[in-house]
């Protein structure tokens, strides 16, 4: 049955959802459209029961942008889409993080959601549309999913909030936030801002939630019209006698352990020991259950399931920690709710890096290094809505040894890409303008230890490494991860959460910013019922923690160093006439390559005539600048050049190219002090010679300008060459 519905979100943003036309063999499918941007979402969930030992939800979310959607050809030899781009991975994570907590607890069927961008108007990003389409596809399927989820992007121009701004509007917006939620609550948040206040952030979330409510109600209407029955699903529940036995045998030990401040590794070892002992006791206690009893009551088999016993112990551990925090305002490492772990900072410890910082907060440690490059080092970004050179990037690496484990070491994982992107967005807002600091900047954050909040350690370490490397940041940025424990109406907001507090808690809310406002945020919620008062509390508590961390960072380095690292390339910019660009580049790049070879400088020329020269030595920079300036200048009498002999006329003289495409004659009488019989006895074609321009005149017959050069005039003075027709310094 084909159904098509339309909703107007205001401000000219009309969204259409249809189902029943495309991908009908999937469990559910939906097409969402905004202007000429369209996404197709499909969902399929396995009907084969998962193995009894499975304790996780194998959800796979794939987001793919087809180049054909925008009438483009993919790059590369094969001319087809390859592995997911960074943009596609980040979009998939946005959708995954919002949908995952909404599936029923205990639903472990293998489920795959594929979002395909099938049309793009190149100005409306399809990522939030993909979230709506994915939720709609699940709603019209038979997969158990009680409440729809919707995603919107919120911008603000001149104080006015905008829902789903296009790329042109985002250029003028001071914030870019993606919000995912249900009719009742927000479950996902991610974005970047230009130092907005906590109150402004809250207003943006409320504005976005109003649009989300409309879209969720819209999806419910669509699902009601399709009216597809949901498949039967009942989560496995542990028998009451099993729960009671486990609580009686391990709750006291787990509580005593929770109230004992320990390092991560020691706590983990002692927790594993309690698990092992409790599992053994439980299996022994229920070993007397017979096959006949299980046949009469299949639930009793769960009492002999090591997997179910493990889950029950985990529930007790979670309950103990949460009650400790709510009842006693005490945390696993002994801190108060708002206390930040001890911080240590070391700068400049990597000698050859252009800047470096080792940032340690508790048992989380990030080593961040800075590399400065030229425009040629910028990353080329080609997406459906963007085609640019990216001159600032932050890469995040999370090796398995950082958590005391072994594991695969290879390509960058989705989590690493997501964490790096968040840290990059936080610092990007305070990076200097290209005109002020024309370098390409790469920060690499290697996590050496992790016990929570490693992405925020990357923000702090990245800021410190940038300042150590002499980048004139507008302001320093710090970051902090907030947690939440909520039971009914009782709740506690935690500052600078540990890994266990993230795992056993209800929220992971990362906030980065300067002293004056927020620059980036990311939030994931595992529960329903998060109200705005809790968000307001979390934002204010995050502000206090952020300022505390900034105080520690400022003690380590009050402001950016005055100069860049000694091994960083030095950039110098000069302006040349646009019509002289070809002269500097030369035929087939001959001239510019020549300058690079002789001076060691790397040269980039923009279309507006801006020439950027990068060289590690001041001498090379000076030589390159002088050569380029002379190349684009008009010939002047008395100026000395380094030229190349182009042609020899034995009885007349030598024609020397002293500027690109500009030849002059060195008369035979101007070659040497003594008389010479043949020019070829002294000069050879291709030879470089130092010449002085002694006369400029027009040929009365042809009207062409002729240049008279002299070698002899320099033999007495022995002056150094001021330039080089081939853009190379003089050599005697």
UniProtKB/Swiss-Prot annotation:
**Cofactor(s) named in the record:** Mg(2+)
The record's Gene Ontology biological-process terms are:
mRNA catabolic process; RNA processing
* SMART domains (UniProt xref): KH (SM00322), S1 (SM00316)
Q: Which UniProt keywords apply?
A: Cytoplasm, Magnesium, Metal-binding, Nucleotidyltransferase, RNA-binding, Transferase
Q: Name one GO molecular function term.
A: 3'-5'-RNA exonuclease activity
The reactions it catalyses are: RNA(n+1) + phosphate = RNA(n) + a ribonucleoside 5'-diphosphate
Primary subcellular site in the record, as a coarse category:
cytoplasm
Entry's Gene Ontology cellular component terms? cytosol
Positions binding Mg(2+) in this chain are 502, 508
Provide the S1 motif domain boundaries.
638-712
Q: What is its EC number?
A: 2.7.7.8
Describe the location of the KH domain by residue ranges: 569-628
Pfam families cross-referenced by the UniProt entry = KH_1 (PF00013), PNPase (PF03726), RNase_PH (PF01138), RNase_PH_C (PF03725), S1 (PF00575)
NCBIfam families xref list: polynuc_phos, PRK11824.1
**Task of the protein:** Involved in mRNA degradation. Catalyzes the phosphorolysis of single-stranded polyribonucleotides processively in the 3'- to 5'-direction.
Q: What is this protein called?
A: Polyribonucleotide nucleotidyltransferase
Species source reads Chlorobaculum parvum (strain DSM 263 / NCIMB 8327)
Gene this protein is translated from: pnp
């Amino acid at each position: 049955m084909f159904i098509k519905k339309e909703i107007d979100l205001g401000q000219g943003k009309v969204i259409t959802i249809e189902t029943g036309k495309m991908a009908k063999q999937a469990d559910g499918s939906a097409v969402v459209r905004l202007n000429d941007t369209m996404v197709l979402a499909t969902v399929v969930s396995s009907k084969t029961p998962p193995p009894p030992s499975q304790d996780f939800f194998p959800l796979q979310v794939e987001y793919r942008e087809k180049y054909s959607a925008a009438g483009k050809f993919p790059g590369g030899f094969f001319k087809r889409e390859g592995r997911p781009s960074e943009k596609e991975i980040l979009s998939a994570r946005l959708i995954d993080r919002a949908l995952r907590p909404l599936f029923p607890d205990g639903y472990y069927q293998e489920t795959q959601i594929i979002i395909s961008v099938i049309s793009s108007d190149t100005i409306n990003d399809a990522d939030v549309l993909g979230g709506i389409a994915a939720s709609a596809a699940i709603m019209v399927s038979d997969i158990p999913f009680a409440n729809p989820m919707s995603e919107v992007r919120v911008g603000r121009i001149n104080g006015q909030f905008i829902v789903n701004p296009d790329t042109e509007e985002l250029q003028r917006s001071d914030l870019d936030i993606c919000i995912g939620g249900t009719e009742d609550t927000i479950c996902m948040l991610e974005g970047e801002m230009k130092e907005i206040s906590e109150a402004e952030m809250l207003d943006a979330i409320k504005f976005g939630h109003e649009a989300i409510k409309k879209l969720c109600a819209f999806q419910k209407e669509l699902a009601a019209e399709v009216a597809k029955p949901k498949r039967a699903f009942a989560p496995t529940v542990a028998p009451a006698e099993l729960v009671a036995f486990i609580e009686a045998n391990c709750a006291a030990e787990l509580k005593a352990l929770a109230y004992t401040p320990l390092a991560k590794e020691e706590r983990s070892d002692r927790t594993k020991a309690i698990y092992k002992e409790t599992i053994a006791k439980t299996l022994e206690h229920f070993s007397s259950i017979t096959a006949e009893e299980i046949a009469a009551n299949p639930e009793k088999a769960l009492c002999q399931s090591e997997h179910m016993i493990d889950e029950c112990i985990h529930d007790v551990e979670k309950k103990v920690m949460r009650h400790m925090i709510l009842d006693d305002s005490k945390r696993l490492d002994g801190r108060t709710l708002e206390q930040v772990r001890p911080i240590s900072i070391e700068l400049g410890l990597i000698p050859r890096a252009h800047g470096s910082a080792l940032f340690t907060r508790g048992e989380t440690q990030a080593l961040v290094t800075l590399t400065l490059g030229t425009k040629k080092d910028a990353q080329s970004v080609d997406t459906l809505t963007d085609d640019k050179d990216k001159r600032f990037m932050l890469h995040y690496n999370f090796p398995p040894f950082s958590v005391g484990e072994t594991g695969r070491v290879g390509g960058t994982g989705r989590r690493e890409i997501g964490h790096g992107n968040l840290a990059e967005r936080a610092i990007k807002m305070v990076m200097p303008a290209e005109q002020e600091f024309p370098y390409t900047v790469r920060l690499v954050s290697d996590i050496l230890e992790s016990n929570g909040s490693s992405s925020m350690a990357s923000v702090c370490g990245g800021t410190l490494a940038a300042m150590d490397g002499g980048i004139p940041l507008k302001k320093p940025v710090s970051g902090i991860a907030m947690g939440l424990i909520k039971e009914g109406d009782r709740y506690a907001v935690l500052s600078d959460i540990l890994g266990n507090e993230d795992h056993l808690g209800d929220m992971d809310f990362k906030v980065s910013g300067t002293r004056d406002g927020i620059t980036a945020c990311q939030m994931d919620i595992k529960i329903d019922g998060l109200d705005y008062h809790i968000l307001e509390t979390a934002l204010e508590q995050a502000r206090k923690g952020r300022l505390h961390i900034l105080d520690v960072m400022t003690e380590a380095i009050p402001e950016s160093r005055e100069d860049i690292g000694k091994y960083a390339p030095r950039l110098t910019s000069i302006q040349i006439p646009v019509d002289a660009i070809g002269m500097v580049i030369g035929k087939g790049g001959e001239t510019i390559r020549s300058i690079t070879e002789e001076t060691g400088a790397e040269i980039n020329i923009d279309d507006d005539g801006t020439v950027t020269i990068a060289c590690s030595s001041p001498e090379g920079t000076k030589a390159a600048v002088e050569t380029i300036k002379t190349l684009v200048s008009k010939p002047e009498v008395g100026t000395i050049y380094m030229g190349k002999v182009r042609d020899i006329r034995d009885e007349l003289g030598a024609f020397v190219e002293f500027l690109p495409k500009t030849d002059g004659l060195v008369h035979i009488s101007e070659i040497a002090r003594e008389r010479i019989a043949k020019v070829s006895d002294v000069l050879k074609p291709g030879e470089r010679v130092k010449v002085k321009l002694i006369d400029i005149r027009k040929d009365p017959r042809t009207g062409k300008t002729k240049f008279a050069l002299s070698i002899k005039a320099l033999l007495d003075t022995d002056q150094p060459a001021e330039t080089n027709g081939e853009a190379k310094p003089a050599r005697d």
